[in-house]
């Protein structure tokens, strides 16, 4: 009889605990992080609950508190990859970038094949202008991974080192593999324009425009290439489209004004150059 009572109590306790855990998970799923933290505080500390606690704290913008939570997990479970990743994310939000790098490195030591961590790690190296290290990491990545993001990271590393020729090569590679990648097209436009290769800039941006004629970033480079290549009628068409889509930026107004002026449409030129002058009254 005592055994039956004991088993009944154990089953009841287990069921109640499972229900409480479910309530925590439901609160987090509903983004009700305050309720989740209140419920977690009533439970015995476990690694899974600490992970939930950290997520709730981050959801409420309590990044310093969340970092402490993930550090507690790491202290008790040094092989918990997720805790290192989350700690790194917290450090980034707190501008503790060197500490974030270390956490990413520890996560990669535990799981070298984790693509998300490697992308974040290289991205952080780039933001810290550690371009040589970023190039090394991204080049290793592209040996096994030819995804657009891997190639972009390598290209950005070359750009940061002012190695524009190999950077351009990377972007051409991306455009060849992923023709719908607008950023590669825009970058090719910008890099070729910077080198005064206007025909190449036009070719790269027009290649993308055969897929999508609406992308603002690509259209800006395309229009500028036509303008600098002195094909003013086409430049005017491209810039007029940008204006019709609400683009009133300095460069759009300025180069549209220049294009109108070159075509001797002085009234239109005046209007757009005047609009551009508002951004730079001393010019």
Can you annotate each of these PLM segments?
Residues 52, 59, 86, 120-123, ...:
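Canonical tetratricopeptide repeat
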Residues 48, 82, 116, 149-150, ...:
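Start-of-helix register in tetratricopeptide repeats
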Residues 39, 43, 72-73, 106-107, ...:
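Canonical positions in the second alpha-helix
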């Amino acid at each position: 009889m005592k055994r039956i009572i004991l088993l009944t109590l154990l089953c009841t306790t287990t069921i109640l605990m499972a229900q409480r855990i479910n309530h925590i998970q439901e609160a987090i799923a509903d983004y009700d992080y305050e309720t989740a933290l209140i419920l977690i505080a009533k439970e015995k500390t476990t690694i899974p609950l600490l992970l939930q606690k950290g997520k709730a704290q981050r959801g409420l913008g309590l990044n310093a508190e969340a970092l402490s939570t993930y550090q507690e997990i790491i202290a008790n479970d040094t092989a918990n990859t997720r805790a290192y990743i989350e700690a790194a994310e917290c450090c980034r939000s707190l501008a503790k970038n060197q500490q974030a790098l270390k956490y990413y490195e520890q996560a990669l030591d535990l799981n070298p094949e984790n693509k998300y961590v490697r992308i974040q790690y290289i991205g952080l190296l780039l933001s810290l202008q550690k371009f040589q290290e970023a190039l090394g990491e991204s080049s290793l990545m592209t040996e096994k991974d030819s995804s657009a993001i891997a190639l972009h990271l390598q290209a950005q590393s070359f750009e940061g080192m002012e190695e524009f020729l190999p950077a351009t090569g990377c972007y051409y590679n991306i455009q060849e593999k992923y023709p719908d990648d607008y950023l590669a097209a825009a970058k090719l436009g910008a890099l070729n324009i910077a080198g005064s290769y206007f025909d190449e800039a036009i070719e790269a941006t027009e290649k993308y425009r055969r897929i999508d004629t609406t992308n603002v970033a690509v259209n800006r480079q395309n229009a500028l290439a036509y303008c600098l290549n002195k094909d003013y009628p086409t430049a005017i068409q491209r810039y007029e489209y940008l204006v019709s889509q609400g683009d009133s930026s300095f460069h759009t107004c300025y180069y549209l004004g220049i294009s109108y002026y070159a075509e001797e449409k002085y009234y239109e030129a005046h209007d757009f150059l005047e609009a551009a002058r508002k951004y730079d009254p001393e010019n």
